[in-house]
Amino acid sequence: MEVILKEDIETLGHRGDIVKVADGYGRNYLLPKKLAMEATAANKAVIEQMKASAVRRSAKEKAEAEQLVAQLDAVALVFERKVGDHDHLFGSVTSSDIAQQLEQQGFHIDRRKVQLEEPLKQTGEFLIPVKLHREVTAHVKVTVKGEETAA
């Protein structure tokens, strides 16, 4: 069965792609969940128009993302956290913390775009990727320091 994807599906392809899937998978999963539609001639024509506008929109978004990369690559974030033995943090620095501090500096970045595999639990300097567009990734320098304690 041929279907046209309405959403990006990691195992199949991107939105607007025409893919062959098993009949049961298409009929029982993709179509009822509105993740795809049948690949008829009329639907193919509509998708071609949508693809053309999506290409223009994607090119514009990519250009904006590339401008943002230059700005983000110059950003250095500093977090101070309480530290225990062996420079291990009490707590951690998460993608939400990074996105929040970027927001305070005037960048509107969703926390899900911060590609942090796991929260930072050590002191040091880290280069954290931020995925701005499907093809564009910026890197933000994050420094985690131990909090100064008054003795």
UniProtKB/Swiss-Prot annotation:
GO terms for molecular function: rRNA binding; structural constituent of ribosome. Binds to the 23S rRNA. GO terms for biological process: translation. Pfam families: Ribosomal_L9_C (PF03948), Ribosomal_L9_N (PF01281). Belongs to the bacterial ribosomal protein bL9 family. It comes from the Bacteria. This is Large ribosomal subunit protein bL9. GO terms for cellular component: ribonucleoprotein complex; ribosome. It comes from Acidobacterium capsulatum (strain ATCC 51196 / DSM 11244 / BCRC 80197 / JCM 7670 / NBRC 15755 / NCIMB 13165 / 161). Gene3D superfamilies: Ribosomal protein L9, C-terminal domain, Ribosomal protein L9, N-terminal domain. PROSITE patterns: RIBOSOMAL_L9. Keywords: Ribonucleoprotein, Ribosomal protein, RNA-binding, rRNA-binding.
